[in-house]
Amino acid sequence: MLRYEERKLNNLTLSSFSKSGVSSDTRLYIAKENTDKAYVAPEKFSSKVLTWLGKMPLFKNTEVVQKHTENIRVQNQKILQTFLQALTEKYGEKAVNNALYMSSINMNKPLTQRLVVQITECVKGADGGFINIIKNKDNVGVMNAALVIKGGDTKVTEQNNDVGAESKQPLLDIALKGLKRTIPQLEQMDGNSLRENFQEMASGNGPLRSLMTNLQSLNKIPEAKQLNDYVTTLKNIQIGADRFSQWGTCGGEVERWIDKASTHELTQAVKKIHVIAKELKNVTAEFEKIKAGASMPQTMNGPTLGLARFAVSSIPINQQTQVKLSDGMPVPVNTLTFDGKPVALAGSYPKNTPDALEAHMKMLLEKECSCLAVLTSEDQMQAKQLPAYFRGSYTFGEVHTNSQKVSSASQGGAIDQYNMQLSCGEKRYTIPVLHVKNWPDHQPLPSTDQLEYLADRVKNSNQNGAPGRSSSDKHLPMIHCLGGVGRTGTMAAALVLKDNPHSNLEQVRADFRNSRNNRMLEDASQFVQLKAMQAQLLMTTAS
């Protein structure tokens, strides 16, 4: 249900902003005196007087003038948002977004009838395809053009690709309203409605077209990089025949796929759209914070799509180093780096759901991990009822596994080794698994020698010729405990020390925290054991 205030504003159309007998430079505002409906009115004489006094040093700091100035700011923002909404309803979000992007009109100025005409003409030009014309690669010299409207005349001037500061807030406001409208529609979608109504959904103001238009606004605002990276990850997820970013267009590969897709395939596609819609609520929440005065986010956790065992508020996932599958699906795993070089993949214990376990297995197979190191003790696995996915034979979605135990004699039976065969379609891969059965949570291993021995075992695991270190997220060891921060960070740091005992452990910890989250290597006793291992290695190399 719409709030009462929103319902009152719904009666305002573009014609509401045209006032006969009023100067074209008179400030407009939304009034609601003596009526249950809002209406557009010219600024009152008393308000003009207070505005004039606010320009005089003697009066501008008085309480009445300062209060008036704040009221004017709120009024200006409200009427601009309402006007842009009226424009959007008539010309569509894409035309309004493009016009705001390309226009150099100052959106911080009070809304007047002159400004109403200028913005409307700019949107009409965008709606008529003028934006596309000046963006066309054949139009040399106007690739980075801006529309400048003066007295109704339109000309083209050079500018960079970033939207002007005065247009950022209106763009975000339109995107916020668009997301609030489209997300519930996407959540209500099912396979039948997708097949029957796709053309409507992917055109005009349909939810899929509208969604892509609103999300496109973010890459025009440099400060919104984290938000843009987040939505880019979501748009790059493969659904059916193409990436989700292509689902806002009719007549292409997506529409042809929908026509031929089975009921099961459509159900799976809708399932992905539902989880993406849920993730987009995080973007809406960030927009709300920005609207309330917060700065653009400087960091963001990556989308988890329901695959993570823990909430990102507990175990953060750096979106810049988040691992993604070949179909674009992000998994709750990060690439740990030290000194700019990948060390290992790190994550929490896989969530005990079919989708999460399938994604985890696909990652092991696609990334051809040199080994899988499970650091969760046997006691903890039983106490928390964690799935022993790495031993036995299972089918997780499209992935089939068959794991055979190789040995358990090493280090007094503390480490079990398995060879786990993975298959998915035509792809096959066998990965060695090391299960450390006696490493308590938040504590070090029983001995420093066992930590060094384990590091050697991980480094020497080299299945199918995969290198132990890589320049990408392939052919790296995959390490996890329960949360993927303490024991996992300790194991990865031990690998760094085996490569170079002179490595600065404080810097290793800092780099791991930058590449995954600020909880990496958080347990003091485990860090002390790393220092002891480093001392042993340095003594050995010196002798």
Curated annotation (Swiss-Prot):
NCBIfam families: PRK15375.1 (NF011902). InterPro entries: Globular_prot_asu/bsu, Prot-tyrosine_phosphatase-like, PTP_cat, SptP_N, SptP_N_sf, Tyr_Pase_AS, Tyr_Pase_cat, Tyr_Pase_dom. The keyword Secreted applies. Its EC number is 3.1.3.48. It is found in: Secreted; Host cytoplasm. This is Secreted effector protein SptP. It comes from the Bacteria. Effector proteins function to alter host cell physiology and promote bacterial survival in host tissues. This protein includes tyrosine phosphatase and GTPase activating protein (GAP) activities. After bacterial internalization, GAP mediates the reversal of the cytoskeletal changes induced by SopE. This function is independent of its tyrosine phosphatase activity, which remains unclear. CDD domains: PTP_YopH-like, ToxGAP. GO terms for cellular component: extracellular space; host cell cytoplasm. Keywords: GTPase activation, Host cytoplasm, Hydrolase, Protein phosphatase, Secreted, Virulence. The keyword Translocase does not apply. The active site is at C481 (phosphocysteine intermediate). Residues 162-293 form the Bacterial Rho-GAP domain. Requires SicP as a chaperone for its stability and secretion. It catalyses: O-phospho-L-tyrosyl-[protein] + H2O = L-tyrosyl-[protein] + phosphate. Residues 315-543 form the Tyrosine-protein phosphatase domain. Its main location: secreted. The record marks R209 as: Arginine finger. SUPFAM superfamilies: (Phosphotyrosine protein) phosphatases II (SSF52799), Bacterial GAP domain (SSF47233), Non-globular alpha+beta subunits of globular proteins (SSF56568).
